[in-house]
């Protein structure tokens, strides 16, 4: 595919031009209850074009190669004096992004893994509600008039299962760049359901422990957006104007790192061709930085942190890569009493500006002096920014979506 031809068309008309080509191939097999539902295979690809001239930016996209896409972008101009295209730079390629084993993985192996997960659940007297195993291979190439020409290829393997045990439902999933043992997914789902089955209505005030999964669901709608320079500049972040201030407890260090080996959201560059980097956001509770793309950085006379995210159908926007909450030496064994929350429902209703939230807890239990009591679904609410002032990260780190974090202990209240 001659992407360079699109650049030449734009330049001939006096426009700086950028072309993003994205392609992905996915194979999945799913369960409907305990029965194998269907195999699905999908190929998707598309091209996004941006053009710049005289302080105006145009954008258009198509799901096939079409020279007219450049002319369409030229007709969609809007005033934008801050957007620029990236310049050539050195890129660090993170390890563990692409595995040939995923390319060679056939439908029979996917089905075998799915049946393995299902049978583990059935053999342990659980009802299987749904499940799935999939592989994906992705490719992207970005070129522009400044001479940037960068491409990346990555692979993904995912497995998930939803079960019911003794009246309690649970769900477990995992995505990695390479193949992993799917048996653990079923065993973790069973463990979640067993620990929270036959729950009691308990109200509690004290140590609230959020698992990495529950944290990701909650922080995606509260904490993470607050570090976006786009939100800061639009007065949609409580962190505006607080660089250098103590915003959290000294236990809290948060880093955004798009260069981390083997992590799910690492890459050579962001959606604009800017090299990814490691950005310290909070150090020992002190706010150090925000996250930027080129446009938002230019507004403040700064440099992009490599946090532009986009697909071929969208313009760049600021987003975290791997959002890391640093662990401590603390563990659950250090606490005699707490409520452990494995999942939450309703995070999307949180206020991303203030950090206020109220969620329903799921697969949770009360622990005191070695005794575990399952909890019926209760409500947990508060303000995420206030809670992080007394938060204690533990040492059980795992990646859930964009979040790499241990479980974190907060002060809070469960209402039933």
Swiss-Prot record:
It comes from the Archaea. GO terms for molecular function: metallopeptidase activity. InterPro entries: Metalloprtase-TldD/E_C, Metalloprtase-TldD/E_cen_dom, Metalloprtase-TldD/E_N, PmbA, TldD/PmbA_N, TldD/PmbA_sf. GO terms for cellular component: cytosol. This is Uncharacterized protein MJ0231. The lineage of its organism: Archaea, Methanobacteriati, Methanobacteriota, Methanomada group, Methanococci. GO terms for biological process: proteolysis.
């Amino acid at each position: 595919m001659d992407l360079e031809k699109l650049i030449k068309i734009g330049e001939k008309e006096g426009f700086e031009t950028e072309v993003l080509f994205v392609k992905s191939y996915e194979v999945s097999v799913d369960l409907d209850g305990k029965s194998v539902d269907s195999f699905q295979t999908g190929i998707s690809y598309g091209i996004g074009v941006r053009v710049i001239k005289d302080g105006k930016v145009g954008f258009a996209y198509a799901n096939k190669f079409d020279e007219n896409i450049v002319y369409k972008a030229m007709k969609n101009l809007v005033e934008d004096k801050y957007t620029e295209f990236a310049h050539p730079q050195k890129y660090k390629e993170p390890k563990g992004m692409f595995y040939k084993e995923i390319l060679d993985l056939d439908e029979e192996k996917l089905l075998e893994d799915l049946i393995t997960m299902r049978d583990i659940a059935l053999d342990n007297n659980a009802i299987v509600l749904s499940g799935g195993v999939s592989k994906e291979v992705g490719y992207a190439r970005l070129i522009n008039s400044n001479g940037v020409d960068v491409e990346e290829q990555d692979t993904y393997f995912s497995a998930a299962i939803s079960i019911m045990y003794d009246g309690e439902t649970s769900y477990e999933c995992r995505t990695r760049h390479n193949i992993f043992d799917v048996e653990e997914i079923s065993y973790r789902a069973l463990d979640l359901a067993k620990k929270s089955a036959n729950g009691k209505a308990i109200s509690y005030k004290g140590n609230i422990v959020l698992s990495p999964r529950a944290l990701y669901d909650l922080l995606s709608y509260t904490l993470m957006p607050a570090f976006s320079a786009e939100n800061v500049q639009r007065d949609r972040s409580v962190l505006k104007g607080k660089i250098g201030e103590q915003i959290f407890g000294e236990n809290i260090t948060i880093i955004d790192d798009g260069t981390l080996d083997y992590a799910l959201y690492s890459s050579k560059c962001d959606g604009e061709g800017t090299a990814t980097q490691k950005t310290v956001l909070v150090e020992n509770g002190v706010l150090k930085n925000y996250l930027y793309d080129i446009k938002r950085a230019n507004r403040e006379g700064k440099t992009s942190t490599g946090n532009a995210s986009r697909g071929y159908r969208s313009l760049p926007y600021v987003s975290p890569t791997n959002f890391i909450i640093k662990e401590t030496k603390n563990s659950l064994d250090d606490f005699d009493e707490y409520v452990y929350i494995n999942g939450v429902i309703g995070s999307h209703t949180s206020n991303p500006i203030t950090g206020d939230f109220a969620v329903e807890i799921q697969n949770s239990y009360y622990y005191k002096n070695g005794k575990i009591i399952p909890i019926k679904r209760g409500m947990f609410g508060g303000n995420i920014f206030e809670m992080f002032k007394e938060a204690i990260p533990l040492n059980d780190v795992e990646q859930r979506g964009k979040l790499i974090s241990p479980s974190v202990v907060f002060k809070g209240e469960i209402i039933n």
